[in-house]
């Protein structure tokens, strides 16, 4: 039911020297800066607890929802990637499939690790340099980590497109 973690258990990436490309959609840099400060958190306690769980769950979606909540948003709020997260963005006309070129900082990025058509993991977009997308993800090896992926990476299911206007 819940979103699983990233199979990559490596350390967070160093973003120094990365030049991000600005798209036409505005993002939320304050949300991104908040999410980046969470890198290194292990176990996800503040996120799944904030969501209302009494014990540890797969917490990637709780992390994303917590970040949106800290930005003052009451929704989207989801603990399951496919049945709640993807469903919310799709039903609100705010979904962009893999290859969508106008992602913005603060958008959600959904992954399908086993390529079965169902999202298994979610993170937040920090930005893109035109060839890679940079993310902050909860529950990546049971920790918050900064990661990057080629924009055409097959395991990217799509993006939850936030409307910050």
What annotation goes with each model-predicted range?
Residues 49-52, 82, 92-93, 148-155:
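Solvent-exposed, flexible loop/coil residues
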Residues 74-142:
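...with weaker cross-activation on analogous glycine-rich loops/strands in unrelated enzymes
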Residues 25-33, 83-87, 101, 154:
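Generic alpha-helical secondary structure signal
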Residues 7-20, 96-98, 119-165:
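Aromatic- and glycine-rich peptidoglycan recognition patches
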Residues 47, 63, 110-111, 159:
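Aromatic-residue hotspot detector
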Residues 4-73:
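N-terminal capping segments
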